[in-house]
């Protein structure tokens, strides 16, 4: 499917299949007991120039594969006045329990990589952002101009700002919870006029993309802010809806566990229907390896989920 990159497959299906939109449905793409609410999902881009007028030079800074993932690692090429770079890097890595790599390009140019831990972009607190940690290290040196602004925003504002407090965009809804922010992709090239940091933001009902963008535009050092064309608004199916009640009843019968509604920052195909939810397949006692290296599930859990789905489908269509 195209679920991780744009959902164009479902757009095509609904447009060409020639059938009316289903009355209800569920997607087995999350966790039990149920996900009946999903926060809005947008990506905002912070734009910076390429002025590099400092005693230290930032030639490039890259990190992250997708906006909806915490960058596992980030790499920078730097030169100029970088006193005791190797020593500071080693001490920094030990202090924060990070892995790193450093190599020389020439006598005064270095390539540095900080290795953290990836996680799903809806739960950035579960990861270790290689990009913001690398910026935190480099921000100790005398960079100038846009390079300095780029590093300062990443190090002082974005680093561990999982709810957007330092960005000035924090918001909490009583039903859907707090906004979350993941600095997902970093791209700085001193030869390019436009350099960016991509922020994946999961927001509850009560705020909106324009309000969020207006807040980001106030961040010192940012030249401009742009919004990705792709995004989703908040989605919620009430707990007393027959679909939700039926699925929770089946879950309780099959597992002996109490069911309850949940709202997540992640996005599933469930939100494509007005009465759509996510239902499984991860169980509450399972270790979440989603979007991480060596992602896996136990075969026993697949059988448990299949039994739940079989009864759920029967109850919904009988």
Regions found by a protein language model. Give the residues of each.
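An extended, acidic, His-containing surface patch that forms the Zn2+-binding/catalytic region
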Residues: 122-192, 198, 202-211, 217, ...
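Short amphipathic alpha-helix segments
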Residues: 46-59, 83-97, 163-178, 210-218
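Structural signature of cysteine-dependent C-C bond-forming condensing enzymes
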Residues: 15-24, 52-53, 59, 93, ...
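Short beta-strand-to-loop capping motifs
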Residues: 48-50, 78-82, 114-116, 201-203
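Short, solvent-exposed loop/linker segments at the N-terminal edge
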Residues: 67-70, 191
């Amino acid at each position: 499917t195209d679920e991780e990159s744009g959902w164009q497959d479902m757009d095509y299906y609904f447009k060409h299949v020639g059938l009316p939109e289903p009355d209800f449905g569920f997607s087995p793409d999350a966790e039990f007991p149920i996900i009946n609410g999903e926060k809005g999902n947008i990506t905002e881009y912070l734009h910076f120039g390429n002025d590099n007028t400092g005693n230290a030079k930032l030639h490039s800074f890259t990190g992250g594969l997708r906006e909806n993932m915490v960058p596992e690692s980030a790499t920078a090429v730097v030169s100029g006045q970088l006193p005791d770079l190797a020593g500071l890097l080693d001490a920094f890595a030990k202090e924060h329990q990070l892995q790193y790599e450093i190599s020389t390009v020439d006598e005064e140019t270095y390539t540095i990589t900080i290795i953290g831990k990836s996680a799903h972009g809806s739960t950035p607190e579960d990861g270790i952002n290689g990009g913001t940690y690398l910026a935190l290290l480099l921000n100790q040196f005398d960079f100038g101009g846009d390079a300095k602004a780029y590093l300062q925003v990443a190090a002082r504002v974005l680093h561990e700002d999982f709810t957007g407090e330092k960005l000035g965009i924090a918001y909490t809804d009583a039903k859907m919870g707090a906004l979350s922010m993941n600095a997902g992709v970093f791209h700085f090239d001193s030869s390019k006029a436009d350099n960016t940091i991509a922020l994946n933001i999961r927001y509850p009902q009560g705020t909106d993309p324009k309000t969020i963008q207006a807040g980001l535009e106030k961040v010192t050092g940012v030249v401009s802010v742009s919004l990705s064309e792709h995004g989703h608004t908040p989605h919620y199916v009430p707990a007393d809806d027959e679909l939700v009640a039926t699925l929770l009843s089946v879950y309780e019968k099959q597992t002996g566990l109490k069911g309850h509604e949940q709202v997540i920052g992640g996005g599933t195909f469930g939100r494509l229907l007005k009465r759509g939810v996510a239902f499984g397949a991860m169980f509450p006692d399972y270790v979440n390896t989603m979007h991480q290296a060596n992602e896996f599930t136990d075969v026993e859990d697949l059988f448990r989920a299949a039994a739940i789905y079989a009864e759920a489908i029967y109850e919904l269509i009988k």
